[in-house]
Amino acid sequence: VKVILAGAGAFGRKHLDAIRQIGGIEVLSVVGREPEATRSVAASYGIPHSTTQLGEALARPGVEAAILCTPTQLHAAQALECLRAGKHVQVEIPLADSWTDAEAVAALQKETGLVCMVGH
């Protein structure tokens, strides 16, 4: 499975550490807020691309899924962006910071048939 990971902070690094232990997963890009810090995380995990733009990472060739380890207030909007881009998505808890936003994500997931899961 070829994935991108959004969130180059502590939770993102925990996910990257876990991914190292699982066969068959290739991280194609890391997305973060600070370019230098994001480049550093990508380099330390051998990830070939880093960016500050989720859309740029989602558009990379071969990307099948996204892992979102970003601040809560970004979860719903980013999950919707991933689904609209045709990618499966795993979101750190909570899925959204409002019921309305959570319902919007659930509705788009049903419409697309893609996997949208909340991990903890």
Protein language model features and the residues they cover:
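Beta-loop-alpha module in the N-terminal Rossmann-like domain of NAD(P)-dependent dehydrogenases
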Residues: 45-106
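Rossmann-fold dehydrogenase core element
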Residues: 104-120
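N-terminal Rossmann-like dinucleotide-binding module
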Residues: 1-45
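Conserved residues at beta->alpha junctions
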Residues: 32, 69-70, 118
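Short hydrophobic "strand-cap" motifs at the C-terminus of beta-strands
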Residues: 6, 92, 119
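Residues at the C-terminal ends
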Residues: 21, 84-86, 111
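Short, well-ordered coil/turn segments that N-cap beta-strands
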Residues: 25, 64, 87, 113-115
